[in-house]
Amino acid sequence: SGNFWERSAAFNGCPIRRGGKIDLLYRAQSSRVLHEGETYEVSSIGHTTSVDGIHFTNHRQLIVPEEPWERFGCEDPRVTEIDGTFYIFYTALSTYPFSADGIKVAVALSKDLKTIDAKHPVTPFNAKAMTLFPEKVNGKFAAILTANTDRPPSTIGVAFFDRLEDMWSVDYWNAWYKTLADHEIKLQRNDAEHVEIGAPPLLTSAGWLLIYSHIRNYFTERKIFGIEAVLLDRNDPKNILAR
């Protein structure tokens, strides 16, 4: 790319269909630059559009590291539209060299995927790969996220909210994290596996379809990377129906 902010790489895209086109949010990685006193490849969130899902044009930066809690990078977006607002969850990096204490979830809000109306830090603990369910579950807003991604074993869990603003409540998340086991979707077959959410859940006639990354032998040099799918109960997403 001719854009310095995506010259090194563009990957981990999350598409969303809007009208007759597809908007794609993705992680962009710059060439090595001096940023916040460090020289490295800085991650930000790019945006591009397509009519056919193959050819994409109009690449531009949408989310850039500017707040203290994301000062060293913004990674891996996942977007869901609720009532006309796009909720873009991403990994916010606040430390360099990167460490678990500085790798957390943040969210950006946008009405048009052109401008960002607000940003919030979300989890006060180490986490990545959060996304909203596109519809309410039992009358509540629902999200799914991966906790302890950099302090394995990781845990994929479900969170429910009466109000969308609760998503960035520190008190809510502190209470949620204390009872993490109660929110877990048990996807690991054994303690040697690592899992992380891929895309936002899709509602089907049979339940919620969730795609996730699955790594075997995670704590060895013989890691085996894979992609798996699981079907979750429509009214109780912690309940696995098929995989």
Predicted regions and their residues:
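Beta-rich carbohydrate-recognition and catalytic domains
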Residues: 1-72, 81-193, 202-243
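Acidic-residue sensor for enzyme active/binding pockets
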Residues: 75
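Active-site/ligand-binding surface loops and adjacent short beta/alpha elements
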Residues: 198-200
